[in-house]
Amino acid sequence: MKQPSRKIQTTIALAFAALVFGTALVMAIISYTFTREAVEENSRAYTEQLIDQVQANIDSYVDHMENVAEVVQLNDQVQRFFTNTIPPEDRELYRGRISAFLTSIAGTRSDISLILIAGDNGEVLTQDPGLELRSVAEIPNQRWYQRAREESGNTVISSSHVQNVVEGEYRWVITLSRTINDPLTGIDHGVMLVDLNFSVISQLVSRISLGDKGYLFIVASDGSIVYHPRQELIYSDLEREYIDRVLEQRDGSFVVSDEKGERIYTVSTSNRTGWRTVGVNYVGELVKNR
């Protein structure tokens, strides 16, 4: 009679062990799920705060550029020179005065690399009379010029690009452009640009840390990349980014999973520029650090 009793005891012990193991496994899964959800939610909230700060700083730079453009646009000498309301013998005098005026404005900020006005009267002035322009005739073919014409009276912010209007200079910049127009009639008399050194944006974003592998990048509303830590690789088709998904997501987040692992993309769109700032966090890294 002892043998059946032992079998029953063994069966009960195995069943109890299985129950304990199963319960522990279920609890571990539940704990992991809740931990992961909590970590992901905290990560989204933290990333949103960082993005908001980055956007506020960028918007501040853009505001300054717009203020510069407005001061130039409303300057009486600029208005008179580009609307041809001064006698021919005074034009050289006005050229010098306006260049000095632009020089004084550009000198207040080291992040401004170029201020240029291209008038419909054929005149082109910059903050430095010594700058040699590549081809005045090619200026109307520049995208920043054309967009300013399309948005007459409104400011237009470009994505990052190489500015090549100055001979021998190929600077990465963010360009603000707008038309020079008569405040009374609204008639356009030319286009002005203010170039902000791209390094300002790059330094602002690159110093933000999202773990060991995470990163931030910025995309313009047309899908062009304003800043990305792997920008050159993307342009060379050596790496891809989920730009289409980002453009579909004005604000909020989405998750992608590929050969690089599972990642959370947190997106926020600036009402000021229309740019989307994106924070990318690696889920595995978040849970591991937890």
Pin down the residues of each PLM region.
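Solvent-exposed, extracytoplasmic
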Residues: I98-G107, L131, L184, V191-L233, ...
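Extracellular/periplasmic ligand-binding regions of membrane signal-transduction receptors
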Residues: D63-R97, D120-E132
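Extracellular/periplasmic juxtamembrane segments that couple receptor/chemosensory ectodomains to their
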Residues: D222, R230-R290
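Juxtamembrane extracytoplasmic/periplasmic/luminal helical "stalk" adjacent to the first N-terminal
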Residues: I8-T85
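PAS/PAC or PAS-like capping segment
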Residues: I180, F198-S199, V283-G284
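Short, hydrophobic-rich beta-strand element in sensory/regulatory alpha-beta domains
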Residues: A69, I112-I117, G214-F217
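Extracytoplasmic/periplasmic ligand-binding sensor regions of membrane-associated signaling proteins
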Residues: A106-S113, D120-L196, S257
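N-terminal sensory and localization modules of signal-transduction and trafficking proteins
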Residues: M1-R6
